Amino acid sequence: MELTEKSRPRIGVMGGTFDPIHHGHLVAASEVAQSFDLDEVVFVPTGRPWQKGAVTPAEHRYLMTVIATASNPRFTVSRVDVDRIGPTYTIDTLRDLHEERPEAELFFITGADAIAQILSWRDVEELWKLAHFVAVSRPGHDLSISGLPQQDVSLLEVPALAISSTDCRDRVNRGMPVWYLVPDGVVQYISKHHLYRSVA
């Protein structure tokens, strides 16, 4: 029985805007991979996130994610959401990944703030069937899964890295450094492509 279960690839799915990707994302993915014995973590940059307004073009966010994850052999990046036309919904992401890897057991990695809103997500009942959800704690967030199916949701505390993409964008816009908040290659990409500079 144990051998049969383990013979199924265990794949983490780390969806996000990644605008920009930072060390907090990478640490969370690494901690979940270790705790849940994942074979791989697929980072999925959103195409056009339905819950957010203006974001950096998807191709920039995809390339920054590729740069940030390149040194970890367990990390890969998928274009499934970037190439989809229209808004990005988690249910579409998981359906597409399940179709690509029907033999895999999927673990969707999300933050405590997002898991609190999950009951408002599209086709939530199908979400539970497609993946196990892992909610990672962020500094200042209380984790609670009351009202959610306990067998489909796990909580995991990760090292407290108080980094946010919003703060990273703001620092760049104010001419402040983001070294050590985001991977070195991403810092260079942001500078080369003049991202997050205010045009107002």
UniProtKB/Swiss-Prot annotation:
GO terms for molecular function: ATP binding; nicotinate-nucleotide adenylyltransferase activity. Its EC number is 2.7.7.18. It is an enzyme of class 2 (transferase). It holds the Pfam family CTP_transf_like. One of its GO terms (biological process) is NAD biosynthetic process. It catalyses: nicotinate beta-D-ribonucleotide + ATP + H(+) = deamido-NAD(+) + diphosphate. Keywords: ATP-binding, NAD, Nucleotide-binding, Nucleotidyltransferase, Pyridine nucleotide biosynthesis, Transferase. Pathway: Cofactor biosynthesis; NAD(+) biosynthesis; deamido-NAD(+) from nicotinate D-ribonucleotide: step 1/1. InterPro entries: Cyt_trans-like, NadD/NMNAT, Rossmann-like_a/b/a_fold. Catalyzes the reversible adenylation of nicotinate mononucleotide (NaMN) to nicotinic acid adenine dinucleotide (NaAD). Belongs to the NadD family. This is Probable nicotinate-nucleotide adenylyltransferase.
